[in-house]
Amino acid sequence: MKTLCIFLVLVVAVAAFPPFISQHDCPPNKEFGSYGDCPPSCLKNPPNFCTLKLNYGCKCKEGYVLTRYQDYESDCIKPEECPDDS
């Protein structure tokens, strides 16, 4: 029983902390940091409501936007490079 309790505490501790990614692990035009639930993207009409949820990971650098709305794995490009049909 003691072993099970220790195991559960370790699982909760690991799950409670965001993954530690260094800046060099982020793709081009991205950097590690915190970002909100509605980061800038190529979407022309983003929603008016966003939660205050804070995410940690690779985010677009200043001056770049996600190619796909709320797809945090998508590439970051300059806004003027967004396709016209976004």
From Swiss-Prot:
One of its GO terms (molecular function) is serine-type endopeptidase inhibitor activity. Residues 26-82 form the TIL domain. SUPFAM superfamilies: Serine protease inhibitors. Residues 1-16 form the signal peptide. Disulfide bonds join 26-58, 38-50, 42-82, 60-76. InterPro entries: Ser_inhib-like_sf (IPR036084), TIL_dom (IPR002919). The keyword Disulfide bond applies. It comes from the Eukaryota. Only expressed in fat body. It is found in: Secreted. Pfam families: TIL (PF01826). Gene3D superfamilies: Laminin. Keywords: Disulfide bond, Protease inhibitor, Secreted, Serine protease inhibitor, Signal. GO terms for cellular component: extracellular space. Its main location: secreted. Negative results: does not inhibit trypsin, plasmin, tPA, thrombin and factor Xa. Is not expressed in epidermis, silk gland and venom gland. Serine protease inhibitor that inhibits chymotrypsin (IC(50)=34.13 nM, Ki=49.85 nM), microbial serine proteases (subtilisin A (IC(50)=21.31 nM, Ki=20.51 nM) and proteinase K (IC(50)=52.56 nM, Ki=65.42 nM)), as well as human neutrophil elastase (IC(50)=11.54 nM, Ki=8.74 nM), and porcine pancreatic elastase (IC(50)=19.07 nM, Ki=11.32 nM). Belongs to the serine protease inhibitor-like (TIL domain-containing) family. This is Chymotrypsin inhibitor.
